[in-house]
């Protein structure tokens, strides 16, 4: 989805995931965020990027997807924004480390299913 930040249609941006019905916007980061214990621990530019998406898309929920070493990491870190409000969430995604492509495909499907199962309750709210 191409998003434009300004009324003159300038400032093109591309969030990685946007669900229009539930107004949730997510961006994938290929960085180690596992040490974060709250959203504000994340690099400021990454937070500002998601807040910008949330504001322009009138979204109440925004988040960052990030790689995790833990196989079953489903701990979602959430923080509520001041001002217009909204919730930011950090979503850990297990990226399998395997010896061959077929094993990777099988294991990443499990990871994708976990992500979808974690997102469903949020999308329904």
Where are these regions (language model features)?
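Catalytic core segments in nucleotide and nucleic-acid processing enzymes
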Residues: 1-125
